[in-house]
Amino acid sequence: DNVKKDELILSSRDQIKGKVNFEIKTDSLLQPQIDILFQKMLPILHPEDIVTSFNWKSIQDFKELFSCRYGIILDHEDALFEAKSLSIHDEDMFFMVERTLLDSRNFDLPLNRTVIWTVNEKNDFVHFLDMGAFGVITDIPDTMHIYRK
């Protein structure tokens, strides 16, 4: 009753309709804490959701337990080689790729499993979708929504 009109309090995942991108940040956590975080998250996942993280190890460790899509986040060119190897060995893995990495001569990930962030130019937005990217994320959703096929 004390909730402001523009404030939403979630007590259940069922209150959220549609797809959710759970971007798990683990920078300040120790491995046992990371494991607990991932274990606690498992029961709230829906098949249409996606779990992503810069913590590739945890995504790999828990991928068999996810009831939804999963992926790794890349923001530097050095990560492209290892990500390419993962893309060959794990056909279910998605890749959340920082926009500038698409311009790298080393970019060779499957576009149908690649989500590009952050794209705020309409022409780039449309171009990436036309290229066959799985999705594009923007900081300006009022102008462009998060598109997914």
Locations of regions flagged by a protein language model:
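Metal-dependent phosphodiesterase/phospholipase catalytic core, i.e.
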Residues: D1-E77, D90-T100
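C-terminal active-site rim and adjoining tail of enzyme catalytic domains
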Residues: D1-L8, S12, G71-K149
